[in-house]
Amino acid sequence: MDTNVQKRRENKKSLRVKVISLGNAEVGKSCIIKRYCEKRFVPKYLATIGIDYGVTKVQVRDREIKVNIFDMAGHPFFYEVRNEFYKDSQGVILVYDVGLRESFDALDSWLTEMKQEMGSQANMENIIFVVCANKVDLTKRRVVDESEGRLWAESRGFHYFETSAQSGEGINEMFQSFFSSITDMCENGGKRPTPEVSVGFTKEQADTIRRIRNSKDSWDMLGVKPGATREEVNKAYRKLAVLLHPDKCVAPGSEDAFKAVVNARTSLLKNIK
């Protein structure tokens, strides 16, 4: 075989990609990476100082993928180090601890920081994101359930996996799906392919479900001010009912959100003359 032809074939098969991990300190980013790359779990917490860098090789179909992994420190102190490593990423692993709600709520701020460093939303659109709901083995301390995490991820077009760095649950499946999607993107000219199947719900539905989950009281849940009239309560209820009725909305958590709205309306109307 001609040497040049052989080299071209080898170059076609070989692919080099850059992946970064994001999330608050102590959510298990480094442990997830070590579990996959080194097949081990490190029980003692060792804070990442700035950036940890590693390289691994994986096989995706007929291609060898050389993955450069940049494990970002989650502490705010290391922002000036992190901000140098966002650009030119093909994949992002977003991690939160299912037992720490603040780590889940912080996912939006991590995306904001990344967007700020990337320069524009367009640069974010051709990156594969995967969300890891980590430490699912610690069931008794869980405060963010699967439906809430899945809703947040899927409403943004991100992959979602339940993982445990300690037990290994979901780790291999997550990385296999992640690297396969990155490969598909690279083979599609660096553009994220349009998913064959849509998630089946809108961002408005997803945001509404999350708002209802986080509501302080029945007034807040329906989006009306305390002291609202019967007509205002019913109008707000009807709008939410149309948006979230389980027969029309397949978003994770929609059934519970709809029930909560029904109960909120009933509770408020009892006290309105």
Swiss-Prot record:
Residues 217-273 form the J domain. Keywords: GTP-binding, Nucleotide-binding, Nucleus. It holds the Pfam family Ras. GO terms for molecular function: GTP binding; GTPase activity. It comes from Danio rerio. Belongs to the small GTPase superfamily. Rab family. GTP binds at residues 23-30, 71-75, 134-137. It is found in: Nucleus. This is DnaJ homolog subfamily C member 27. One of its GO terms (cellular component) is nucleus. GTPase possibly involved in regulation of the MEK/ERK pathway. One of its GO terms (biological process) is intracellular protein transport.
